Amino acid sequence: MELDKIRNLSDEELKVEDNKAQEQLFRLRFQMKMGQTEGVKKLRELKKDVARIRTISRERVLAIRGAAPLAESSAPAKTKSRARKSKKEAL
């Protein structure tokens, strides 16, 4: 599925397409294990489609919630050499 088509889908349609692609992927993997098909190219395309759909879905979730909070504080941490100097000065 093309990226433009995926971006134009609603959230509900994205979920439906994700479920369809997952089911097709399951069936294709099962057929490959049973030796009924050699659809390696189709398997690769389905995996990429699932990744595209989930990426677009995740982008929408993050846009609603805003940016992720920063993990570190803005104040610089003391280095070991500064800590040692302050201990020596205290004595």
Swiss-Prot record:
Xref: InterPro entries: Ribosomal_uL29, Ribosomal_uL29_sf
Keywords, ordered alphabetically: Ribonucleoprotein, Ribosomal protein
Transmembrane segments: none
Entry's Gene Ontology cellular component terms: ribonucleoprotein complex; ribosome
Gene: rpmC
CDD domains in UniProt: Ribosomal_L29_HIP
Compositional bias segments (type: Basic residues): 79-91
Protein family according to the UniProt entry: Belongs to the universal ribosomal protein uL29 family.
Region feature Disordered, mapped onto this chain: 67-91
Name the record gives this protein: Large ribosomal subunit protein uL29
Annotated GO MF terms: structural constituent of ribosome
Highest taxon in the source lineage: Bacteria
Record keyword Protein transport present: no
Keyword Chaperone belongs to the record: no
Gene Ontology biological process terms in this record: translation
